From Swiss-Prot:
Gene of this entry: pheT
Keyword Metal-binding assigned: yes
MF terms (GO), sorted A to Z: ATP binding; magnesium ion binding; phenylalanine-tRNA ligase activity; tRNA binding
Protein name in the entry: Phenylalanine--tRNA ligase beta subunit
Keyword line: Aminoacyl-tRNA synthetase, ATP-binding, Cytoplasm, Ligase, Magnesium, Metal-binding, Nucleotide-binding, Protein biosynthesis, RNA-binding, tRNA-binding
Species whose genome carries this gene: Nitrosomonas europaea (strain ATCC 19718 / CIP 103999 / KCTC 2705 / NBRC 14298)
């Protein structure tokens, strides 16, 4: 929202500089993005009239002009000028001798032998434009001799507010003025809106078929309007400084009324309306040529303003080109309405364009001003363009009801940490122009019609804080009773525990969008039917992810492109999948490791991280439970270096090296090891049990067995752990051999067995029996034989 600082000062009696005001607004929650001067500094620049123009005797492209600046008692100034558009009788801007312009100072001198006593200026030379075709030409009624800077109000600045969507009330000068008056405790002086008495009886029938979408519609006929007149200088300046361009006087006036009040309006050419105005939803196969030149095929959920035969405008968004006011329009129909934010919201995004009207209606406008704005625009049109106004037709239905909200004095003190008296709270509500009643220490406050953001008690408490000043609320530590409660060890958040474990293992957490590229889903998940977004924030983020792999690989690419070769990252996030017609959301944990296994260190030999390093990290996440891995294929992973992760024989995730195909496709200079797990599998914690240390010596035995080469070590270990003798405390693999000394298709596995009893020293017979039992299990289940 852009506006003129001078305009604001007409509405509020301010005692603050522009910079002070910008700071106060920002501190109160209305962020001032910039405060820019309308024009750079210059002085001794006046309005002048060119009396005569003669060719320079010594230069073909120069003219010698006699110029009336209104201050020369002895005649006119002689000025040499090279502008192509200089002509006799024109009014322009003259910098007198001694004037200081943005890029030069004006001195008396001779140009090609002819004395020049000043300079006729272009907009560029005054710093008012970045380029210019010639002299700045002024309207014919501009008085000669007046100070140009003062007459055109160039000692002004343009405020740019960065409004949040909830503050639609500040999309008009009246709303901004109320806000400024409340924050600064200044006097508000809004112009009085006088209702115009009709002088003709012409009316247009209005029919509202969708009262829920259009609870209030006001319209009026004005005949005999002169669209060839110019709007006043003060109005054009305010519009230009708000970033609006001039179109024609009627459109300029309704734009001004919108800028002033925040209520959008529309003007129709009365002669283009057939019989009536009807507010309805679009029908099938209806089209509308909009003011922006786009021909629109209307959808059934689009509210339109129509006559008896065709749509005329897209309600609350943009008018139609065929029914719009032009320079030949004589009779107009003015519209001022309140359209429900629900019916307007999202339409601009869907259509691919927006408008000042849609921007306001989708956030909510002040429905109490709908009729008043129509009267304000009518008065300005009659004053500037002439014409005769008919009576107002008003169709009103169920407008939004603003219920009183209870605001408690004690609640204010609790939320803000400051005690406010009833008198001070009343003062702040009065400054905010809230209607309220008091019952003891309770206020019952009715929010204004323009404030759709005030719904609950805390909203009003925030308003008190804003008016009081956030910077004036003292910082105090909260006081709360502290009771140290015993927390069960299993009560620790599993997500917190996972973060602690992974960060302790030198991983860094990343957070990626849940919206990803369709190609990622195909490459890394083999998902051909991802959940698609109707309104993606970008074309390459059009589906919901079913795996975290894509984001991590993108993070790896980002780091490698910036010479970061050692990458250890993890992400905890939601993944989405479709099962039939049902869409499901699950929480996953994924990690990626690439590059060196350890940070660079002179005493440690450098090596790349491998599958087994990451496998060990996974085992630490599940400890003290046992994790099993089985060879399996995954679309994202290397077919010979990938495995499914199992807990209690149930699949809970994947681990593996990135598939070489994707390493090549995504231009990765090095590969990576990845894993992904369901966090629900990690949430079921087992507390480690306490066992007393045995006082008796342990015994170690080694066995080597020969099995088929396709038998997995994991299955051997799992079987041995399940069926071993109670005296065996540990079993671990310490050697694997396959070669010439074995039959082809066989491999040798050497296991180290630790035996220990907590109650006695084991005898040789007990040890031999336990080891023999273990070998027997392997012979029966896997056809293993002892290696001699």
């Amino acid at each position: 929202m852009k506006f003129s600082g001078n305009w604001l000062r007409k509405l509020v009696d301010l005692q603050y500089s522009d910079e002070e005001l910008a700071h106060k607004l920002t501190m109160a929650g209305l962020e001032v993005e910039s405060v820019a001067p309308v024009a750079p500094f210059f002085d001794k620049v006046v309005v002048a009239q060119v009396v005569s123009v003669q060719k320079h005797a010594n230069a073909d492209r120069l003219n010698v002009c006699k110029v009336d600046v209104g201050t020369q008692s002895d005649g006119f100034l002689q000025i040499v000028c090279g502008a192509q558009n200089v002509k006799e009788g024109m009014k322009t801007v003259c910098a007198l001798v001694g004037a200081r312009l943005p890029e030069l100072d004006i001195r008396q001198g001779k140009i090609r032998g002819v004395e020049s006593l000043g300079m006729l200026c272009s907009a560029k030379e005054l710093g008012l434009a970045s380029d210019a075709d010639g002299l700045l030409e002024l309207p014919g009624d501009t008085p000669v001799g007046v100070d140009f800077r003062k007459y055109y109000s160039l000692d002004d600045c343009i405020f740019t507010l960065k409004l949040t969507p909830n503050r639609a009330d500040c999309l008009g000068m009246f709303g901004i003025a109320r806000e400024v008056a409340a924050i600064t405790a200044s006097e508000l002086d809004l112009p009085e809106i006088v209702f115009v008495n009709p002088v003709i009886e012409d009316v247009l029938q209005i029919r509202v078929e969708e009262p829920e979408s259009c609870p209030l519609y006001c319209g009026r006929v004005i005949k005999g309007v002169a669209t060839d007149t110019a709007i006043p200088l003060w109005m054009s300046q305010r519009l230009e400084r708000a970033g609006l361009r001039m179109i024609n006087p009627v459109v300029d006036i309704i734009n001004y009324a919108m800028l002033e009040t925040g209520q959008p309006m529309h003007a129709f050419d009365l002669n283009q309306i057939n019989q009536e105005i009807c507010v309805r939803f679009a029908g099938e196969n209806e089209h509308l040529l909009l003011l922006n030149g786009e021909r629109l095929t209307l959808q059934k959920d689009m509210l339109v303003i129509a006559d008896s035969s065709k749509p005329l405008a897209l309600a609350g968004i943009m008018g139609g080109s065929e029914s719009g006011v032009t320079n030949t329009t004589i009779d107009v129909f003015l519209e001022s309405a309140f359209f429900s934010p629900v019916v307007i919201s999202g339409k601009s995004f869907k259509l691919g364009f927006t408008s000042d009207s849609a921007h306001r209606f989708e956030r909510g406008v002040d429905f109490s001003m709908t009729r008043s704005v129509l009267e304000r625009a009518t008065a300005l049109i009659l004053e500037i363009c002439g014409g005769k106004a008919g009576p107002v037709t008003e169709i009103g239905n169920d407008l939004p009801r603003r219920e009183a909200v209870r605001v408690r004095q004690k609640r204010i003190a609790k939320i803000l940490g400051v005690d406010f008296s009833v008198e001070l709270i009343s003062e702040y509500f009065q400054r905010l122009q809230f209607s309220y009643t008091i019952a003891g220490e309770m206020f019952y406050v009715v929010p204004p019609a323009a404030r759709f953001d005030l719904v609950i008690e805390e909203d009003f408490i925030e308003e008190i804080a804003r008016v009081h000043g956030y910077d004036l609320i003292p910082a105090r530590l909260p006081k709360a009773p502290v009771h140290m409660l015993a927390e069960p060890e299993t009560g620790v958040s599993p997500v917190k525990r996972l973060r602690q474990i992974l960060t302790a293992k030198d991983y860094q957490e990343v957070i990626n969008y849940t919206f990803v590229d369709t190609q990622w889903e195909a490459d890394f998940s083999g998902n051909d039917i991802p959940i698609r977004l109707k309104n993606p924030i970008a074309s390459h983020m059009d589906v919901m992810r079913s795996s975290l792999f894509g984001g991590l690989i993108d993070n790896l690419q980002f780091n490698l492109n910036r010479k970061q070769s050692r990458v250890r990252i993890f992400e905890l996030g939601s993944c989405f999948s479709k099962e039939g017609d049902e869409e499901k959301e699950v929480e996953n944990l994924a990690a990626l490791c690439s590059g060196s296994a350890y940070p660079e260190q002179w005493g440690v030999p450098d090596r790349d991280i491998d599958f087994y390093d990451v496998k060990m990290d996974i085992e630490s996440l599940f400890w003290p439970r046992s994790v099993y891995f089985e060879l399996a294929l995954h679309p994202a992973l290397h077919p010979g270096k990938s495995a499914r992760i199992l807990i209690d024989k149930k699949p809970v995730g994947w681990i593996g090296e990135l598939h070489p195909r994707w390493q090549s496709k995504y231009h990765l200079s090095q590969s990576a090891i990845l894993f992904e797990l369901r966090t629900e599998a990690l949430a079921a914690e087992l507390l480690p049990a306490m066992y007393p240390l045995s006082k008796f010596p342990p015994v170690r035995r080694d066995i080597a067995v020969v099995v088929e080469s396709d038998v997995s070590v994991a299955s051997l270990l799992e079987t041995m752990h399940l069926e071993k003798d109670r005296s065996i405390s540990e079993i671990s693999l310490f050697d694997l051999y396959s070669g010439e000394k074995l039959v082809q298709g066989k491999k040798s596995l050497a296991f180290r067995i630790l035996l220990q009893d907590s109650e006695k020293t084991l005898t040789d017979q007990e040890i031999d029996r336990a080891v023999s039992q273990l070998v027997g299990i392997l012979e029966r289940k896997f056809g293993a034989t002892l290696r001699s």
